Amino acid sequence: MSTFGKLFRVTTYGESHCKSVGCIVDGVPPGMSLTEADIQPQLTRRRPGQSKLSTPRDEKDRVEIQSGTEFGKTLGTPIAMMIKNEDQRPHDYSDMDKFPRPSHADFTYSEKYGIKASSGGGRASARETIGRVASGAIAEKFLAQNSNVEIVAFVTQIGEIKMNRDSFDPEFQHLLNTITREKVDSMGPIRCPDASVAGLMVKEIEKYRGNKDSIGGVVTCVVRNLPTGLGEPCFDKLEAMLAHAMLSIPASKGFEIGSGFQGVSVPGSKHNDPFYFEKETNRLRTKTNNSGGVQGGISNGENIYFSVPFKSVATISQEQKTATYDGEEGILAAKGRHDPAVTPRAIPIVEAMTALVLADALLIQKARDFSRSVVH
């Protein structure tokens, strides 16, 4: 499906080499200030051609709001946004009419629909995520205005090069409390806040690019100032919805929240997060945050933090022995312009999908609070 969310809903449209990509966002409350200037910064962070570490495809990715606002205010009606595809080269994909790319969606899309886009990855292309980022920027503004929510993602691993993300380490927890987007972006195109490994990550990507290959990595994201009570019991737990959102991003291959897989080797006596009463905020807090801000599927007011691994980009120009759709063995060396590592550009996409989940959860909780007030 191309629609995500229940009350705060987004439908994305477009393929890699069609005339435009974009989205329709429904459920945005009326009266909220909104212009293209609120959306463009995140699209600019996502756009290709930012450095030698990304694809050279030259897209400006300028957003145009088509409906749902008037005089800079939302009307409460669906908001349509369009971004033109300006640097199309469909001829780069002529060989892929015969060969499904290894580990790409060419084969599975063809099997599912009986047809596939002849240029690029179609809906499986990362160009589809432009609509996510545009709608996520609206969700972020809604969250910031309602609860001062902050969402910051950053790169913690490229290939074998990794920074510390030990959830039991006070230094890492301090980083989660203080990291900002300005700090992340100040580290250059790699977007890793640890200067001691950022340069090594750049060299790692350059090494694989030089070999006409690609490499994967990990994005970590933190959410601060989220209210308590968001998320549903059982099937729509907050971490389940976040996992759903993250695993819908192209090239993502997993999800872990809080202590994640690291927590399985820690006894409950050390893993539990004891409570204390904080007078300044007049509420219960936890002394540690191994739960990652979610207990029983519901936000507890602490930082939510999670990590998402992204696989090596499937489309590479290195020769690969593979087979055509007809089963004939052959050699594929993909043409086109592709990222040697998608992880740094995934940052605003992870932030956007996080914002969409949380905006939806906040609206659902507000509806529940209203119904409870009516009953009582």
Curated annotation (Swiss-Prot):
Gene Ontology, cellular component aspect: cytoplasm; cytosol
Record keywords: Acetylation, Amino-acid biosynthesis, Aromatic amino acid biosynthesis, Flavoprotein, FMN, Lyase, Oxidoreductase, Stress response
InterPro entries: Chorismate_synth, Chorismate_synth_AroC_sf, Chorismate_synthase_CS
EC number(s) on file: 1.5.1.38, 4.2.3.5
CDD domains: Chorismate_synthase
Region annotation (Disordered) ranges: 39-61
Pfam families listed in its UniProt record: Chorismate_synt
Active site: H17, H104, D339
An example Gene Ontology biological process: chorismate biosynthetic process
Consequence of gene loss (knockout): Impairs sporulation, probably by blocking the biosynthesis of aromatic amino acids.
Upregulating conditions: By amino acid starvation. Expression is increased in response to DNA replication stress.
Catalytic activity: 5-O-(1-carboxyvinyl)-3-phosphoshikimate = chorismate + phosphate; FMNH2 + NADP(+) = FMN + NADPH + 2 H(+)
Gene3D superfamilies: Chorismate synthase AroC (3.60.150.10)
Pathway(s) per entry: Metabolic intermediate biosynthesis; chorismate biosynthesis; chorismate from D-erythrose 4-phosphate and phosphoenolpyruvate: step 7/7
PROSITE patterns given in the database record: CHORISMATE_SYNTHASE_1, CHORISMATE_SYNTHASE_2, CHORISMATE_SYNTHASE_3
Molecular functions per Gene Ontology: chorismate synthase activity; FMN binding; FMN reductase (NADPH) activity; riboflavin reductase (NADPH) activity
Functional note: Bifunctional chorismate synthase and flavin reductase that catalyzes the conversion of 5-enolpyruvylshikimate 3-phosphate (EPSP) to form chorismate, which is the last common intermediate in the synthesis of the three aromatic amino acids phenylalanine, tyrosine and tryptophan. Also acts as a flavin reductase (FR) able to generate reduced flavin mononucleotide in the presence of NADPH.
Oligomeric and partner information: Homotetramer.
Note in the entry: Present with 2310 molecules/cell in log phase SD medium.
Family, similarity comment: Belongs to the chorismate synthase family.
Name of this chain's protein: Chorismate synthase ARO2
Originating organism: Saccharomyces cerevisiae (strain ATCC 204508 / S288c)
Gene from which the chain derives: ARO2
